Amino acid sequence: WMDCPLRLNLLSNNKSYVSHKVNTIKVGKDISWSDNLLRGIQELKNDYILVLLDDLLLKNKISNNYFNQISNWVTENNPNYLRLCISHKPNYFDDLIGEIPLVTPYKTSTMPSIWKKSVLKDLLKEGESAWDFEINGSKRAYNYDGFYAVYNNFISYKKIFCI
């Protein structure tokens, strides 16, 4: 996403990535996925964060026009979570975005998403892996409304696995 309008923050345990476009946040010793994320997001000042994990390769060019539509929607609707990829079809909310049911599997999917930082911090629990968070965090999120998903992929990706 060469012309990304966002300030990029890279969470790393100890290494730095030197670029004028990227701010590295070092979280220190690896304890767990959720501990690392909790430590990292405490450094962020924004109310909303776009979360992309390192095991995804972007497949297509990202549309800044579509991003601007999504960004405006977030500003107007104040969601707790907005999934940017299609997994489970959401219920109709408006022409751009659908609503994720209150109780649904993988409600807190780690797919590319925009999170209200305070809600993400509340749902993360120390010691959990990303997979634990998708299962257990989804159950904790049953108490939250305001979870949404796009009808059309904003980000198309290929998942990579390292052995």
Question: Where are the predicted features?
Answer:
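N-terminal anchoring/stem segment of glycosyltransferases
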Residues: 1-29, 41-43
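Short, flexible, basic/aromatic active-site loop/helix in glycosyltransferases
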Residues: 92-105
